[in-house]
Design a protein with these regions (language model features):
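Positively charged n-region of N-terminal signal peptides that target proteins for export
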Residues: 1-4
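Bacterial N-terminal signal peptides
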Residues: 6-15
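Sec/Tat signal peptide C-region and signal peptidase I cleavage site
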Residues: 15-21
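N-terminal mature ectodomain segment of secretory-pathway/periplasmic proteins
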Residues: 22-116, 149-155
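Flexible, processing/modification-adjacent segments and terminal tails
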Residues: 22-30, 39, 103-176, 196-199, ...
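A short, sequence-level motif marking secondary-structure junctions
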Residues: 83, 104-108, 125-131, 181-182, ...
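Gly/Pro-enriched, hydrophobic low-complexity segments
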Residues: 96, 157-253
Length: 271
C-alpha cells in the first residue's frame, strides 16, 4: 500500500510539473526578478542612429525588399542616465550640431527641437530600454506606457516559430511587449499607429544583439519597423558606468536652451 501511494504521488508530481512550469509570473514577481538583475546606477551611452525609408519602391512600383537608407537623416546621441532620477539625451547630427535636447531631472522636464529643418519629437529620441531596465517599478511602467502599453497582464506567448516568451499587455489590441522568460531581457515592443482612415500601421521595436557590461545585459542594437519594414536602427557605440554625472553643466545647458527657444518645462510631469 505504501509503495502504491508513493507511486501515485510521484505520478501526480510529474504531471503537475509542466503545468507549474508554464504558469506565468504575477506582475509583482516579474518586477522583483527584474529589479534583481539591474546592476547599473549611473551610465553614459553613445549611440548611432540610421534612418531608412520604409515605403521606398523599386522600378516596378513594389516595396523594396532591401531597406533604403537615408544617410542625410541619420544622427547620433549622447545619453546621461541615473536610475530613477535623471535622463538627458543630446541628439546631434553627423557634424556634432545639436538637433534636440531632452532634459529630465526628477520633476523637471525640458524637451526641445533645435533645428527648424529637422524637427524631432520626444518619442523619436527616447532610449526605451534604459527606462525599462530601471530598478523602480514606476520607471518600468512608464517605459511601457510611453509605447502605448497600459494593460499589465502577463501571459506566455508562443511565436509562429514556436519560441516561448513572456508577454506584457493585451495581444488582441496589438499593444504588448515580449520578454525572454529566463533572463527577462526585453525582446520586442508592439504597438499600432492609427491613421485618419481608421486603418493602422503595425509598429514593432526589436531589441537584439545583447551584450553584458559590468554584470548588466543590454541590447546593442534596436530596430524599428512599420508593417515589418525597417525605418530606424539604433546601435550602441560606447557605454560606461559613472560614479557621478556632469549634472551641473547639463543643467546650465538646459536653462540656456530654454531661454533661447520656446520649450516645455513642467513640474510633476508625466509622459
Amino acid at each position: 500500500m505504501r509503495l502504491i501511494l508513493i507511486f501515485l504521488i510521484g505520478t501526480l508530481f510529474c504531471f503537475a510539473a509542466p503545468a507549474a512550469a508554464f504558469f506565468p509570473l504575477s506582475w509583482d514577481d516579474l518586477m522583483f526578478q527584474m529589479e534583481k538583475r539591474m546592476s547599473w546606477n549611473r551610465a553614459k551611452l553613445e549611440t548611432v542612429v540610421q534612418v531608412f525609408d520604409p515605403f521606398a519602391k523599386n522600378a516596378d512600383g513594389e516595396f523594396s525588399k532591401i531597406p533604403v537608407e537615408l544617410p542625410a537623416r541619420s544622427f547620433k546621441q549622447v545619453i546621461h542616465w541615473k536610475d530613477g532620477e535623471i535622463l538627458i539625451v543630446e541628439t546631434q547630427d553627423e557634424q556634432g550640431q545639436l538637433l534636440h535636447f531632452y532634459y529630465e531631472n526628477k520633476d523637471e522636464l525640458l524637451s526641445i527641437s533645435l533645428n527648424d529643418n529637422r524637427t524631432l519629437e520626444t518619442e523619436d529620441i527616447l532610449p526605451h530600454q534604459l527606462r525599462f531596465r530601471s530598478r523602480y517599478e514606476d520607471d518600468r511602467s512608464r517605459a511601457l506606457e510611453e509605447t502605448g502599453i497600459i494593460y499589465k497582464a502577463i501571459a506566455y506567448h508562443i511565436s509562429d516559430d514556436n519560441h516561448v516568451f513572456l508577454r506584457i499587455g493585451d495581444f488582441e489590441s496589438g499593444h504588448f511587449a515580449l520578454l525572454n522568460p529566463k533572463t527577462y531581457d526585453l525582446i520586442s515592443i508592439h504597438n499600432r499607429l492609427w491613421l485618419e482612415d481608421e486603418t493602422w500601421l503595425e509598429l514593432k521595436i526589436v531589441f537584439k544583439n545583447y551584450e553584458t557590461y559590468r554584470w548588466q545585459t543590454y541590447a546593442k542594437v534596436t530596430e524599428y519597423f512599420l508593417d515589418n519594414r525597417l525605418f530606424k536602427r539604433t546601435t550602441v557605440s560606447k557605454i560606461r558606468t559613472l560614479s557621478r554625472l556632469p549634472i551641473k553643466e547639463l543643467q546650465e545647458q538646459a536653462w540656456k536652451l530654454r531661454h533661447l527657444q520656446t520649450a516645455t518645462l513642467q513640474n510633476n510631469y508625466a509622459l
